[in-house]
Amino acid sequence: MILFPAIDLKNGQCVRLEQGDMDRATVFNLDPAAQAASFAAQGFEYLHVVDLDGAFAGKPMNAQAVEAMLKVVKMPVQLGGGIRDLATIEAWLGKGVTRVIIGTAAVRDPALVKEAAKQFPGRVAVGLDARDGKVAVQGWAETSTVTALEIAQRFEDAGVAAIIFTDIARDGLLKGLNLDATIALAEAISIPVIASGGFASIDDVKALLEPRAKKLEGAIVGRALYDGRLDPAEALALIGRAAAA
């Protein structure tokens, strides 16, 4: 079970949004690289980074901040936001990103995901962000007519490394993960699934360690860390004990 601390980038700063609304952004750190180093020092083993401006623009917009993070941390980094073509994927993987996350393009251009997964095995994840059961795209500004399961099933045999499933209604609101929907998705496909949206406290860690969540690869945690509602040492120790049991 992997806990992915999240760094969301807006105007080169580390922010958290509420329900994906760019007008409801709280700046938590002016220096994303320092934030990444802090997460590494706390013992996290995999970093989750999103270029929020890039998600809206359809191309990388916070490249300088991402590159600064890649220089200071040795842990794997998965990156999403504005990754819509093979050239961008190849560029980021070449710069040291471990895994790219394709969101909007996974809905609009599934062939891109399949080709990328073929060219870069194990290094392409799909981000599915759902609002009322339907997948949202373009930085969550638009909602499609397809469900997360319908899209995930398109990639069943494509070699996608993971599906990151976000419940937009909970994102940034500290209401707890939507494990029912996430587990239902994980049980319907063979691709590993990562839970995202609403992580609130140590109770979410405990829920992730229950037998029913065994198919999940992990979860992304954002505001709960920044607000001090989740003690990293306590969370990682709990996961470590469960892994050793």
From Swiss-Prot:
Single GO term (MF): 1-(5-phosphoribosyl)-5-[(5-phosphoribosylamino)methylideneamino]imidazole-4-carboxamide isomerase activity
Reactions it catalyzes: 1-(5-phospho-beta-D-ribosyl)-5-[(5-phospho-beta-D-ribosylamino)methylideneamino]imidazole-4-carboxamide = 5-[(5-phospho-1-deoxy-D-ribulos-1-ylimino)methylamino]-1-(5-phospho-beta-D-ribosyl)imidazole-4-carboxamide
Pfam families attached to this UniProt entry: His_biosynth
GO biological process: L-histidine biosynthetic process; L-tryptophan biosynthetic process
Catalytic residues (positions): 8 (proton acceptor), 129 (proton donor)
Matching InterPro entries: Aldolase_TIM, His_biosynth, HisA_bact_arch, Isoase_HisA-like, Isoase_HisA-like_bact, RibuloseP-bd_barrel
Pathway: Amino-acid biosynthesis; L-histidine biosynthesis; L-histidine from 5-phospho-alpha-D-ribose 1-diphosphate: step 4/9
Subcellular location: Cytoplasm
Listed GO CC annotations: cytoplasm
Domain of life according to the entry: Bacteria
Primary location recorded for the protein, binned into one broad class: cytoplasm
EC number assigned by the record: 5.3.1.16
Keywords recorded for this protein, A-Z: Amino-acid biosynthesis, Cytoplasm, Histidine biosynthesis, Isomerase
PANTHER family documented for this protein: 1-(5-PHOSPHORIBOSYL)-5-[(5-PHOSPHORIBOSYLAMINO)METHYLIDENEAMINO] IMIDAZOLE-4-CARBOXAMIDE ISOMERASE
UniProt-listed HAMAP family: HisA
Family assignment from sequence similarity: Belongs to the HisA/HisF family.
Protein name, entry field: 1-(5-phosphoribosyl)-5-[(5-phosphoribosylamino)methylideneamino] imidazole-4-carboxamide isomerase
Gene name per UniProt: hisA
